[in-house]
Amino acid sequence: MKKIIGALSLVLLIGCSLSGNRKNDACNHSEWYGYVNICLPTIDGMKECRLHPRVQAFTQKYRESGPLLGYYLNDKTYQRIDSLGTFSFDNYFMLYGDYNRENYEATATDLPLMQQQLEQSLVGTNWQERGRQVEDVYNTLMIGQPAIIEKYSPCSDVLTMIVLMKYRQENGQESTVISAANCILVKKRLLNMAYYMAYDGGKTIDLLKERNDGAVQKLMQLNQ
């Protein structure tokens, strides 16, 4: 696609802590965010390609409000990277910041406010609070009106929203996207990490959360 955060899991929390202590992953790739160097994780089946000229051109509008620290395409899409922007795609990650807070020393108390601001910017409806089922939400979803399906914390210092959104493609066809919008506190800095997939029923949400949570954990482990 061209244009285009439940309950705390003790198992994941322990996993973040223990894995971070093992230091299994080297910081082979990193990007500066203000005065802080952020290590970029490797994600299975994906290529990090933020510096590719086509990615730079494709993400120009995102970079007007903040730096793009990481951009991950799956292997299949990466094979067509030279024509990025001429076809629709999904299954990609974005790690980005905000110029207004890149040198702000944040604490854990800033995370809920950050998530609240993100939720307000979506101008969506929190269906989790209303007790609606996902398929019920999907059947009543309107273009340009995102629905927040779930909120949870996959790891310490991370708040995640699962967002369902319908939009109209340039050819007039309607598409539905499910995304994980992560608010992250790492090295006293606030970052966003988003993962997008085409929605294909409830199973898509489980897969999205599995992949998203794994990538977020790797990011936190590398930046302990």
Language model feature labels by segment:
Residues 170, 181, 213-216:
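Core RNA-modification/binding signature centered on pseudouridine synthases
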Residues 42-44, 52-54, 163-167, 195-197:
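A mature extracytoplasmic/lumenal domain signature
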Residues 22-68:
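Start-of-domain marker
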Residues 175-186:
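Short, surface-exposed beta-strand/loop micro-motifs that present aromatic residues
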Residues 2-10:
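Sec-dependent signal peptide recognition
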Residues 60-171, 176:
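Conserved polar/disulfide-associated segments of primarily extracytoplasmic proteins
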Residues 188-224:
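Surface-exposed amphipathic alpha-helical segments
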Residues 14-15:
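C-terminal motif of bacterial Sec signal peptides marking the signal peptidase cleavage site
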